[in-house]
């Protein structure tokens, strides 16, 4: 990411670096911290696109100087890295949870879907940003590589469940995996948490009924 794209000037960069290096043990300034800065940045990235967001825009939205932002992070690329890592770490934790389930592959696959829904509900802005990256920067390329790794894990579980005879064999496992997680990922487009509304468990129940009722093999009549 170039300085021009960030809207960063040399003085702000030097001031921010000096603050980070010289005050490494100091806590964030009153009124905001790294977490609140990250959440605002993710909101703006989702609204304007990562490439369309400058450090000037982030400074304006936060109501603080750019040097104050550099006190916490090296630039907007670090904010993007933190954001997509949070989403991906959540999804890989979901896969670890699924791997620990004893029994058949289809049971592990359903656990993975349910745990992934919980991640999307809990970290919706971060997952939204992850699903919108296009590989224009090194951070985005790395995120896409991790997404492909996750996709392979899902496809592997689908293939295993098919080999067990629990999933219909007339659909390619890679296609099944994409369709299944297309349903999961669609949550970012329509789900909005609200009091009294459906929670992660209710959404996961509905999604699994729709998906797995169509995927499971039927006993021969």
What residue ranges belong to the model's regions?
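Short hydrophobic/aromatic patch on the recognition helix
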Residues: 63-73
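Hydrophobic alpha-helical bundle segments that form small-molecule/ligand-binding pockets
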Residues: 100-103, 148-176, 191-194, 215-218
């Amino acid at each position: 990411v170039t300085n021009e794209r960030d809207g960063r000037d040399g003085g702000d960069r030097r001031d921010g670096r000096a603050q980070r290096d010289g005050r490494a043990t100091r806590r964030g300034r009153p009124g905001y911290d790294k977490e609140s800065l990250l959440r605002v940045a993710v909101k703006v990235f989702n609204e304007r696109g990562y490439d369309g967001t400058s450090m000037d825009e982030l400074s304006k939205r936060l109501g603080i100087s750019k040097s104050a932002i550099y006190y916490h992070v090296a630039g907007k690329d670090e904010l993007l890295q933190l954001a997509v890592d949070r989403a991906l770490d959540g999804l890989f934790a979901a896969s670890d949870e699924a791997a620990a389930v004893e029994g058949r592959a289809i049971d592990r696959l359903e656990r993975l879907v349910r745990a992934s829904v919980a991640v999307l509900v809990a970290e919706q802005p971060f997952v939204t940003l992850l699903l919108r990256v296009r590989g224009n920067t090194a951070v985005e390329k790395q995120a896409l590589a991790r997404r492909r790794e996750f996709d392979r894990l899902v496809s592997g579980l689908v293939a295993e469940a098919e080999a067990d005879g629990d999933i219909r064999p007339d659909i390619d496992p890679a296609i099944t995996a994409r369709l299944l997680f297309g349903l999961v990922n669609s949550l970012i487009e329509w789900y909005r948490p609200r009091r009294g509304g459906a929670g992660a468990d209710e959404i996961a129940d509905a999604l699994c009924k729709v998906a797995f009722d169509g995927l499971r093999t039927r006993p021969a009549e």
